[in-house]
Amino acid sequence: MKAPDSPRYEFGGPLGATGIVFGLPILMQVLYLGCNDVSGCPAPALLDPKTLSWAKLKSQIPWPQEGLSGFMSWEVTRWLFAYYFLSLMLYRIMPAQIVLGTKLRESGKPLEYRFNSFSATVVQLTGCAIGTYIYGANFPVWTWITDHYIQLLTTSTVLTYIISIWTYLRSFSIKPGNPELREVAVGGRTGRVIYDYFIGRELNPRVTLPFFGEIDIKAWLEMRPGLTGWILLNCSFIAKQYRTYGFVSDSIVVIALIQAYYVLEGQYSEAGLLSMMDITSDGLGFMLTWGDIVWVPFLYSTQCRYLSVYPVHLGPIGVGAIGTVFCIGLYIFRSSNNQKALFRKDPNNPAFANMTYIQTKRGTKLLTGGWWGMARHVNYLGDWIQSLPFCLPTKAAGYVILPAGTAVAGAEVAKMLDGRLVTPGDAAPWGMLFTYLYSAWFGFLLIHRERRDDYACSEKYGKDWEEYKNKVRWRVLPGVY
């Protein structure tokens, strides 16, 4: 068995980290340019590789007129920083729940956290709701977001590099036994610069600012700007669909509501973050920073962005089916997690009278009945099922935008207010590469987390964990994986 302090590589080690650090930002730009409101999703030129040329592709994508310099602007930078400043203000002035985290590895002491992201998001959404009531779909916030999407994406990416480089360099000022309780994450002390920068070196970097006080950067980024921004992006795409077609489709409303619930429920239960590996084990590096402020808001809103250009009509049966899938996933996720939490708190509760468990040498018990007798991480199965309704409303995605006056007919043809037509054409189902990427990625992420958890539990419980795995054979999906 490895010593606890012996780091091990994840995500392909230094080579994989290099690919992610420099490749993912390019991928996000490609996803936006390739699935667009100019020519189609994917852009028609991409469907014919034999005749593909840069000149042809450039004419079919929203490439800025200014060229590369158009990917950023000082105006967008100022407003993005204003958004972060607003989030900081709400963090500081609104009532908050003060919670102690888990005990740190080296000092054995907990850090204090301030949580009020739910109420802060509600305030921001309320303000936008009032603005929408006054201005309708032309509310300046909604039009500005969709008009400056590429600049917002690029500026957020640059901000990711700034934050992650700063936290990496700052981590070398940590001294053993420091009174600020600063620690280096176990996984971020390999000595390989690119890997440690990617995975995160300092466990819980904090900064003290005038008026705002002490801020845990990792927890703040995890629960605030990206998650709230995800909802705001979705709302801006709903408004765009209305401006484009004069109506709002049931599909975009269903996705926006489900995703808003997902975000708000997580923010309402913000204190639950403190037991997650993101907080207890992972340092703050490129991986978490990028995920929090770029990957989550911009990738996870792809479906609403798609539907803003090509509305899909589900009908009552379709809406009911999507809602049912979400509720099933939510039930599995919540029920299994609640069962585990209750067992940890009160293993002698009558609810566990007929359930089996393993008594470990550490003195704790591992539940091998109920949900946790079906799979070691059955909660991850529920979480993944919850992700499917984010993508399913886009159906067999893909569309081509045709000029006004084009002679084409069919039930799946949508006509914009400016006369342009949108039809699946040869693009379907290639658009699924864009709209279903989230669900595929989330499945990969959960499998990766399960592997990390398995390693951590093996280190923690030793032979007891091997016994547990013999009794509970399946990792996530009973009978399959």
UniProtKB/Swiss-Prot annotation:
Pfam family of the protein (one): ERG4_ERG24
GO molecular function: Delta14-sterol reductase activity
Main localization (coarse): endoplasmic reticulum
EC number: 1.3.1.70
Top-level enzyme category: oxidoreductase
Keyword tags: Endoplasmic reticulum, Lipid biosynthesis, Lipid metabolism, Membrane, Oxidoreductase, Steroid biosynthesis, Steroid metabolism, Sterol biosynthesis, Sterol metabolism, Transmembrane, Transmembrane helix
Lineage, broadest ranks: Eukaryota, Fungi, Dikarya, Ascomycota, Pezizomycotina
Catalytic activity: 4,4-dimethyl-5alpha-cholesta-8,24-dien-3beta-ol + NADP(+) = 4,4-dimethyl-5alpha-cholesta-8,14,24-trien-3beta-ol + NADPH + H(+)
Note: In Fusarium, the biosynthesis pathway of the sterol precursors leading to the prevalent sterol ergosterol differs from yeast. The ringsystem of lanosterol in S.cerevisiae is firstly demethylised in three enzymatic steps leading to the intermediate zymosterol and secondly a methyl group is added to zymosterol by the sterol 24-C-methyltransferase to form fecosterol. In Fusarium, lanosterol is firstly transmethylated by the sterol 24-C-methyltransferase leading to the intermediate eburicol and secondly demethylated in three steps to form fecosterol.
Subcellular location: Endoplasmic reticulum membrane
The protein, known as: Delta(14)-sterol reductase ERG24B
Pathway: Steroid metabolism; ergosterol biosynthesis
PANTHER family xrefs: DELTA(14)-STEROL REDUCTASE, DELTA(14)-STEROL REDUCTASE TM7SF2
Topology relative to the membrane: Multi-pass membrane protein
Phenotypic effect of disruption: Exhibits significantly increased sensitivity to amine fungicides, including tridemorph, fenpropidin and spiroxamine, but not to non-amine fungicides.
Family affiliation: Belongs to the ERG4/ERG24 family.
Transmembrane segments: 11-31, 80-100, 125-145, 149-169, 244-264, 279-299, 313-333, 427-447
GO cellular component, one term: endoplasmic reticulum membrane
Function: Delta(14)-sterol reductase; part of the third module of ergosterol biosynthesis pathway that includes the late steps of the pathway. Catalyzes the reduction of the C14=C15 double bond within 4,4,24-trimethyl ergosta-8,14,24(28)-trienolto produce 4,4-dimethylfecosterol. The third module or late pathway involves the ergosterol synthesis itself through consecutive reactions that mainly occur in the endoplasmic reticulum (ER) membrane. Firstly, the squalene synthase ERG9 catalyzes the condensation of 2 farnesyl pyrophosphate moieties to form squalene, which is the precursor of all steroids.
One record GO biological process: ergosterol biosynthetic process
